[in-house]
Amino acid sequence: MDLKAKPVLVTGATGYVGGRLVPQLLNAGYRVRALGRSVAKLKGRPWGGHPQVELAQGDVLDYDSMAQATQGCSAAFYLVHSMLADPGTFSETDRQGAENMVKAGQDAGLDRIIYLGE
């Protein structure tokens, strides 16, 4: 299994971990599909204009956007946690996003999903 043959998806690419992972993946020879809720924020990253980076807008809470984002990828890094969620709904919101990632990844035939736990 050659994970470099297709792009890898990085969710939460505008966040602390995602923003630092993208350049590491590029240095290792991967093509990256960087997912964020705002393409403008993705473009503003130092790697936003890199020729091996595809910018994608989406939200892990929206299954359709996750299904589209995972298509054609070999693997996905799930680096999103619901920091903006109401404290009373944090767990539910976080669970829904993770479930969407897993289902979209299975439907797209991803070889791996790498999950950043708490």
What are these regions (language model features)?
Residues 7, 74-75, 112:
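Structural motif
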Residues 80, 114-118:
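Active-site beta-alpha turn of Rossmann-fold NAD(P)-dependent dehydrogenases/reductases
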Residues 44-108:
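NAD(P)H-binding glycine-rich loop region in Rossmannoid oxidoreductase-like domains
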Residues 2-30:
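N-terminal Rossmann NAD(P)H-binding glycine-rich loop of SDR-like oxidoreductase domains
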Residues 12-18, 58, 72, 97, ...:
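Glycine-centered flexibility sites
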Residues 29-31, 52, 110:
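A generic structural signal for alpha->beta connector loops
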Residues 35-40, 59-60:
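N-terminal Rossmann-fold cofactor-binding loop
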